[in-house]
Curated annotation (Swiss-Prot):
Annotated compartments: Cell inner membrane
Protein name in the entry: Glutathione-regulated potassium-efflux system ancillary protein KefF
Reaction(s) this enzyme catalyzes, per UniProt: a quinone + NADH + H(+) = a quinol + NAD(+); a quinone + NADPH + H(+) = a quinol + NADP(+)
Lineage, top ranks: Bacteria, Pseudomonadati, Pseudomonadota, Gammaproteobacteria, Enterobacterales
Assembly description: Homodimer. Interacts with KefC.
Pfam families: Flavodoxin_2
Record family assignment: Belongs to the NAD(P)H dehydrogenase (quinone) family. KefF subfamily.
Organism whose genome encodes this protein: Citrobacter koseri (strain ATCC BAA-895 / CDC 4225-83 / SGSC4696)
Keywords, sorted A to Z: Cell inner membrane, Cell membrane, Flavoprotein, FMN, Membrane, NAD, Oxidoreductase
Cellular component aspect of the GO annotation: plasma membrane
GO biological process, one term: potassium ion transport
Co-factor requirement: FMN
Binding site for FMN: H8, S14, H15, A16, N17, M65, Q66, W67, Y68, T105, T106, G107, G108
Length: 176
């Protein structure tokens, strides 16, 4: 099962993430947990989130990039749900050998994230990758959709279909 942990503070204004989720929903075996819809008060049901993670074989952290990081509710979710003794540390093996993919949308172009004036994706992904590895997760190559503020609908749809193809390829390679 693919579990998408979706964190968009303003989903009603989303163009790219909305299309990505629409494409993901067309696949069997995909569960989407929209954190800002589930927890508008930021009071996370840790047990429910851990149960969802336990069912998953591929976990996706999907969100718009905000200040080169994750939205605040996703960070809180990580702090609470990825608990010592459950996700890491003594007895913390619940996530071991599951796959994790970071699916992120950006307003900037792909060239903005090339090494140069701003940090590249290799640098920006390090905290997430370190978290994944610390929890025993297999870090998969990220999926990034760039220029989402200026892309036309056709481009957004094409990129969202590419996202679906990544998920489908994972399902085929991992038998669901």
């Amino acid at each position: 099962m693919i579990l998408i942990i979706y964190a968009h503070p303003y989903p009603q204004h989303s163009h790219a993430n909305k299309r990505m989720l629409e494409q993901a929903r067309t696949l069997d075996g995909v569960e989407i947990r929209s954190l800002y819809q589930l927890y508008p008060d930021f009071n996370i049901d840790v047990a429910a989130e851990q149960q969802a993670l336990a069912r998953a074989r591929l976990i996706i952290w999907q969100h718009p990039m905000q200040w080169y990081s994750v939205p605040p509710l996703l960070k809180l979710w990580m702090d609470k749900v990825l608990a010592h003794g459950w996700a890491y540390g003594h007895g913390g093996t619940a996530l071991r050998d599951k796959d994790l993919m970071w699916a992120v949308t950006t307003g900037g172009g792909e060239s903005h994230f090339a090494i140069g004036a701003y940090p590249g994706f290799d640098v920006l992904s390090q905290p997430l990758q370190a978290t994944a590895l610390y929890c025993g997760l297999n870090w998969l190559p990220p999926f990034a959709m760039h220029c989402t503020f200026v892309c036309d609908d056709e481009t957004l749809q094409a990129q969202a279909r590419h996202y679906k193809q990544r998920l489908l390829a994972w399902q085929e390679a991992n038998h669901g």
